[in-house]
UniProtKB/Swiss-Prot annotation:
Organism the protein comes from: Streptomyces rimosus
Residues that hold S-adenosyl-L-methionine according to the record: D205, G231, D232, F233
E.C. number: 2.1.1.335
Any single biological process term in GO: antibiotic biosynthetic process
Lineage: Bacteria, Bacillati, Actinomycetota, Actinomycetes, Kitasatosporales
Protein name listed in UniProt: N,N-dimethyltransferase OxyT
Enzyme class: transferase
A Pfam family per the record: Dimerisation
One Gene Ontology term of the molecular function aspect: O-methyltransferase activity
InterPro entries given in the database record: COMT-like, O_MeTrfase_dom, Plant_O-MeTrfase_dimerisation, SAM-dependent_MTases_sf, WH-like_DNA-bd_sf, WH_DNA-bd_sf
Membrane-spanning ranges: none
Phenotype of the disrupted gene, per the record: Cells lacking this gene are unable to produce the tetracycline intermediate anhydrotetracycline (ATC).
Reaction equation(s) it catalyzes: 4-amino-4-dedimethylamino-anhydrotetracycline + S-adenosyl-L-methionine = 4-methylamino-4-dedimethylamino-anhydrotetracycline + S-adenosyl-L-homocysteine + H(+); 4-methylamino-4-dedimethylamino-anhydrotetracycline + S-adenosyl-L-methionine = anhydrotetracycline + S-adenosyl-L-homocysteine + H(+)
Length: 344
């Protein structure tokens, strides 16, 4: 089967759309930064009302709102604007699957990192200009409580959808407890626990996150079933559990530390215990443009180029003494792979 080549003008138009794709991203970023979707959550407003309540003074305010209509983020009814169903569901603060946290992270950090891509490629340094990258960056992120809260909102965006997939795809019936290593403030752990009432969960992450984790655990009424442990998972004792979950943690570390962590998890688990790993993993048979760009993004943010294939993950997990029981792609925001392995 052959495909008809695009006419020159169509090819040129496609390239033009690509080079101006940031127009769409920045329109969304600014709308969230301004609090537009929160403003319209309770009802529609005119352009003048929006300008007044959000203190917008630029004469292009109406064109900005019309652009959001064209992007299907707003809907227009006469001279009034309201949130589209998607914006109401995902871009209003407090929504159960709020995406605004990651939109703000992309607006305030990732966008600027990508602006330095050329320099990063030529000079060999990560484009973020951060003081630290990889695992060393996280303690610095969490020194300031407000910054830590912003980072948690970014992480929550992804872990909300991942939790749904893990709750559905992993057979939890044979386990009574689990611990999420590097589980941030516990968004994934609490969601999995809510989906499976027989489970008791725990989160192991840096001590600075304890207040935010406690806040979320109380908010979801799980004080008796989910707990937080602060510490260093490479040196401190790991709490006992029937299963260990870890996601987007292993690539932060060089191979020796990764192997050390997997060995420590294996040692901590009982016979029959499960290791549940989810992460961006390369797979030639299913790779998409989104996958490749996400790996590039993660490398720029983390300051390295680490990306492992499904087979490399499987090999490291088996080398640690586990037997892989399940490996499949899951339907979360990043299109992660899920590997479930058992300690014999």
């Amino acid at each position: 089967m052959t495909t008809t080549p695009l006419a020159p003008v169509a090819q040129a138009r496609s390239l033009l759309q690509l080079t101006t794709a940031y127009h769409q991203a920045k329109a969304l970023h600014s709308a969230v930064e301004l609090g537009l979707f929160d403003l319209l959550a309770d009802g529609p407003a005119t352009a003048e009302e929006v300008k007044d309540r959000l203190r917008i003074v630029h004469p292009l305010a109406k064109e900005f709102l019309d652009a959001l209509v064209a992007l299907e983020l707003l809907e227009a009814d006469g001279d009034r604007y309201r949130n589209s169903p998607a914006a109401q569901a995902f871009l209003v603060s407090g929504a159960s699957e709020y995406l605004g946290g990651t939109v703000l992270q992309h607006a305030r950090k990732h966008y600027h990192v990508w602006a330095g891509l050329t320099t990063a490629l030529q000079e060999g340094e990560a484009g973020s200009g951060a003081e630290a990258h990889g695992p060393e960056a996280y303690p610095k992120h969490y020194e300031d409580p407000e910054r830590a809260r912003q980072v948690m909102a970014h992480f929550d965006t992804f872990s909300s959808f991942t939790a749904e997939e893990l709750a559905r795809r992993v057979d939890w019936s044979g386990y009574g407890s689990f611990i999420d290593i590097g589980g941030a403030r516990g968004n994934l752990a609490t969601r999995v626990a809510l989906a499976h009432p027989h489970l008791h969960g725990a989160v192991f992450d840096l001590p600075a996150l304890a207040p935010l984790a406690g806040e979320l655990i109380r908010e979801r009424g799980l004080e008796g079933r989910v707990r937080f442990h602060g510490g260093d998972f490479l040196t401190d004792p790991l709490p006992s559990a029937d299963a260990v979950v870890t996601g987007h943690v292993l690539p932060d570390w060089p191979v020796p530390q990764r192997r050390k962590l997997l060995a420590r998890i294996h040692e901590a688990l009982p016979s029959g215990g499960a290791l549940v790993v989810y992460d961006l993993m390369t797979d030639p048979a299913t790779t998409t443009v989104h996958d490749v760009l996400q790996r590039l993004n993660h490398g720029l943010i983390r300051g390295d180029s680490s990306s492992s294939s499904v087979e490399e993950y499987r090999a490291e997990i088996e080398e640690a003494g586990f037997r892989v029981r399940q490996a499949e792609r899951i339907d979360n925001l990043l299109g992660d792979w899920l590997i479930v392995a058992v300690k014999p």
